[in-house]
């Protein structure tokens, strides 16, 4: 196995979970940005949320254009951090189904590993209810693909995944989280324009489609934009309180220095 383990930063993990919980009916996807060290450990520092051109319940696809754009973003982060950043993996959600990758997922992963043997895949299974406690659960796994013995098919190999705690939310992950509502809105707009451009639709159907479009946007504002804004406001208030505490501590230390002098 090319990769020994994967370490994902806590704020990048938070973006993945938030993205996975944003859509219950279809799968969502994104790309992981990070680096691979000499011990074959993958370190994921940030993620890029991808826009879906085609919403499907059971699969997702990454276009070459999206992969190219992610590579450019990785180069930008490499220039900022001075570290060898690159696209090291992909993630997608499994709403209401098992966390284990499907045969399509395993084949897709094998295709990516042909370009980079260190490429990894992450899956987040969400909207799953525990039968005993009746509470929701989020399961996640990391995997790679290997060729099965005496077969042309590929099989999954689980890769240990460790979430590295992070006390703060770095700017690059904060930007990804803020980008989520805009991407979801763009997906709805694309779907509406694609349907609205059909010439054979009558007036009643167009009005109905417009109502559905408005309803979906309002649902996104209620489920995604509103909570995200509240979370950002809470973080801002926490930062302000912390700044006041540090300022008070600074003034106290300066006063003690004057006393000693």
From Swiss-Prot:
UniProt-annotated location(s): Nucleus; Cytoplasm; Cytoplasm, Cytoskeleton, Spindle pole
Family matches, as InterPro entries: BRCC36_C (IPR040749), JAMM/MPN+_dom (IPR000555), JAMM_MPN+_peptidase_M67A (IPR050242), MPN (IPR037518), MPN_BRCC36 (IPR033860)
MPN domain mapped to chain residues: 6-149
Cofactor: Zn(2+)
Keywords linked to the UniProt accession: Cell cycle, Cell division, Chromatin regulator, Cytoplasm, Cytoskeleton, DNA damage, DNA repair, Hydrolase, Metal-binding, Metalloprotease, Mitosis, Nucleus, Protease, Ubl conjugation pathway, Zinc
Any GO MF annotation of the entry: cysteine-type deubiquitinase activity
Keyword Cell division: yes
Motif (JAMM motif): 92-105
Entry keyword annotation includes Isomerase: no
GO biological process per UniProt: cell division; DNA repair-dependent chromatin remodeling; double-strand break repair; mitotic G2 DNA damage checkpoint signaling; positive regulation of DNA repair; positive regulation of NLRP3 inflammasome complex assembly; protein K63-linked deubiquitination; proteolysis
Name assigned to this protein: Lys-63-specific deubiquitinase BRCC36
Protein's organism: Xenopus laevis (African clawed frog)
Gene transcribed to yield this protein: brcc3
